[in-house]
């Protein structure tokens, strides 16, 4: 079957033909290619068409598709283990590596996704502080947990859904919304609820309303406010962890969170997640503390092997980050030059190996309101043109593009060549 036939058949058995909404290309007039295989920075669909991949499975594939060392680790592990639901040495290896190589992580708990990591971190923060309210930021996406689906980014923003049916009012009544990069909105909430807020959760570099870095002074003030009021500061580094730097966004800003969540890259391409932080907080988790959180597949040996191999390879090769910074800078510069040549209203935000070209007439895109002003119709046409040109980018204006270790200058030139023909 060709791409269209497979997709139409899939629609009979899966809602929208997909298992995650953004994959359906519902905001575009083309159907998604059905991907068959990948190698390095390239993916190939069922019809044999090759694409330069700047989606990277929405971030995880930083080493490229089918990295030989990761594949070998997976193959060696499955010969002896697929799942036990019991302790293994592999989970110790990954946990120890993370604690020893990351800042601000004294202990870590493995889970199976970014959503699990963030919802578990919130539960832990509430249990530790004995408070119920949390603060999240408009446009930040922390997974599909009920309490987060308020003013969320990612697919919720792409689909223009104000929230989501099926989320009871009671699930979100303790979720307070502040404005990203606007500290006065945070201060006002703490003044109103000085002893009720358990935590602030934030993407230090937002990636789900497009790439929007937090201002350094903004994060510093969040740290000060949390310390003052006895609330916890949670950095959602599901996307930025091991990507914008090995030690994540917090290492670029020099701001210390109490808890950090991870996923995507840390699983080497397999379903993964983790949260960690201060020992006194993490020791509140069951079985040594009162906060209960569990998972049948948590610490799965195959995932642990892939994750351990990936993180060790990234940690032992700092030149990878130098390379991705170089490629990212060249791509950003090139997009800006071509946009100017063609009279396209484009603002490029980039932090290391993630970037977003916003089709916006504003001078800068620094917050949620700026992001929402983007010309999504124009971006949609650009997306369709690039896909047809063999450049695989996100169908949504509000998702990031990802640079990987295997991307090179030639692929930057291919991207820019395609853009010039738009």
UniProtKB/Swiss-Prot annotation:
**One GO cellular component term:** cytoplasm
Magnesium as a keyword?
A: no
| Subcellular localization(s) per the UniProt record | Cytoplasm
Cofactor(s) the record lists: pyridoxal 5'-phosphate
Which EC number(s) does the record attach to this protein? Answer: 5.4.3.8
The lineage's top-level taxon is: Bacteria
Reaction equations catalysed:
(S)-4-amino-5-oxopentanoate = 5-aminolevulinate
Pathway connected to this protein: Porphyrin-containing compound metabolism; protoporphyrin-IX biosynthesis; 5-aminolevulinate from L-glutamyl-tRNA(Glu): step 2/2
What Pfam families would the database entry show?
A: Aminotran_3 (PF00202)
Q: Which residues carry this modification: N6-(pyridoxal phosphate)lysine?
A: 264
Biological-process GO terms, alphabetical: protoporphyrinogen IX biosynthetic process
- Name the family: Belongs to the class-III pyridoxal-phosphate-dependent aminotransferase family. HemL subfamily.
Task: State the NCBIfam families in the record.
Answer: hemL, PRK00062.1
Q: What is this protein called in UniProt?
A: Glutamate-1-semialdehyde 2,1-aminomutase
């Amino acid at each position: 079957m060709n791409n269209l036939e497979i997709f139409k058949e899939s629609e009979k058995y899966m809602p929208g033909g997909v298992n995650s909404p953004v994959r359906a290309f519902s905001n575009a007039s083309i159907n998604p290619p059905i991907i068959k295989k990948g190698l390095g920075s390239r993916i190939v669909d069922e019809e044999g068409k090759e694409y330069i991949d700047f989606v990277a499975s929405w971030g995880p594939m930083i080493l490229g598709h089918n990295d030989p060392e990761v594949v070998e680790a997976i193959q060696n592990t499955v010969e002896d283990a697929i799942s036990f639901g019991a302790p293994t040495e592999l989970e110790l290896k990954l946990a120890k590596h993370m604690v020893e190589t990351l800042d601000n992580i004294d202990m870590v708990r493995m889970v199976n996704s970014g959503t699990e990591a963030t919802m578990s971190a919130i539960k832990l923060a509430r249990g530790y502080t004995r408070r119920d309210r949390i603060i999240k930021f408009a446009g930040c996406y922390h997974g599909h947990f009920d309490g987060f689906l308020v003013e969320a980014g990612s697919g919720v923003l792409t689909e223009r859904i104000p929230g989501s049916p099926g989320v009871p009012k009671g699930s979100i009544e303790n979720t307070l919304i502040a404005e990203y990069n606007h500290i006065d909105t945070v201060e006002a909430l703490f003044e109103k609820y000085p002893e009720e807020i358990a935590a602030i959760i934030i993407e230090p570099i937002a990636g789900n309303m497009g790439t929007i870095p937090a201002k350094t002074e903004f994060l510093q003030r969040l740290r000060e406010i949390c310390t003052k009021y006895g609330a916890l500061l949670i950095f959602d580094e599901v996307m930025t962890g091991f990507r914008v730097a090995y030690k994540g966004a917090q290492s670029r800003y020099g701001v210390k969170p109490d808890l950090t969540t991870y996923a995507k890259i840390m699983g080497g391409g397999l379903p993964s997640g983790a949260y960690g932080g201060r020992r006194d907080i993490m020791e509140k988790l069951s079985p040594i503390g009162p906060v209960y959180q569990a998972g049948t597949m948590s610490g799965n040996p195959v995932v642990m092997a892939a994750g351990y191999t990936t993180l060790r390879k990234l940690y032992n090769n700092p030149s990878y980050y130098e390379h991705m910074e170089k490629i990212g800078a060249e791509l950003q510069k090139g997009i800006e030059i071509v946009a100017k040549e063609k009279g396209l209203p484009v603002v490029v935000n980039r932090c290391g190996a993630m970037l977003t070209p916003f089709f916006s007439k504003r001078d800068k895109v620094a917050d949620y309101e700026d992001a929402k002003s983007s010309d999504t119709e124009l971006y949609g046409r650009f997306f369709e043109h690039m896909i047809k040109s063999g450049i695989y980018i996100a169908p949504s204006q509000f998702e990031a593009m990802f640079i990987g270790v295997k991307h090179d200058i030639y692929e930057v030139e291919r991207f820019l060549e395609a853009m010039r023909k738009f």
